[in-house]
């Protein structure tokens, strides 16, 4: 049982929509393992994703990570994890800056594809669409940098940093 399970069912989640880069998936697994956050991977990925490659991407964080795979966007929406909490999409086309949003326990933070973001149907399904302000002469942050910033703020707001030093 992971730390995410130990602290109750209404916990933050991170979801990656059809990731393009396997190294980013590995970084997301590590991020989620360290923060006690469940990770949803919405397939298809732009790279072959097997149980073996997932274990390789997780490195030694696999046993500490709660990773759920979903065959499609529709399967993700029907999953038990999606029946609670809001869907919070991080996008360069966001309506509100991260710092103006009030996170709640149970929110799922959704990250789009590195190459293309998410389609309109995903935008429409989101309860909130956020952006992280960056300098105007730059295009975007790495998807896992966005996930780390977003989860950090969400956990800060909801009191989710309840870890004791090792």
Sequence positions of predicted segments:
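Post-transcriptional modification and biogenesis factors for structured RNAs
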Residues: 1-166
